[in-house]
């Protein structure tokens, strides 16, 4: 499922926990192996809310990163979490975790 684009390229925030963004980035390690970083960034102050490093871009990586981010999150805050349309962000399990914690899903357009 593709979520609406709630950010509409407005990457500014006036307070913490208004707008978060996430993606998975591939890096090459010194030994030639690939490492994948999955962070959540708060657009208010560019702080990393949570992150996970993995040797493969899999659901467990995204789930761990997301569960770190929701610890202590007030469901009423209504934070927007924006991503691309990657398969991880379209999963039912991902959308369920967002809904359970009052997070509004947003996706960019291709």
Predicted stretch roles:
Residues 1-110:
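Charged DNA-binding/catalytic regions of mobile-element recombinases
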């Amino acid at each position: 499922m593709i979520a609406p684009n709630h950010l509409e390229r407005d990457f500014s925030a006036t307070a913490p926990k208004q707008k978060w963004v996430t993606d998975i980035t591939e890096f090459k390690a010194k030994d030639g192996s690939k490492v994948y970083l999955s962070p959540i960034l708060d657009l208010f102050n560019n702080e990393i809310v949570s992150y996970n490093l993995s040797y493969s871009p899999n659901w467990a990586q995204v789930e761990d990163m997301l569960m770190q981010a929701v610890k202590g999150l007030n469901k009423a805050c209504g934070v927007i979490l924006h991503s691309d349309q990657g398969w991880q962000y379209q999963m039912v399990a991902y959308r369920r975790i967002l809904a359970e914690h009052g997070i509004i899903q947003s996706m960019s357009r291709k």
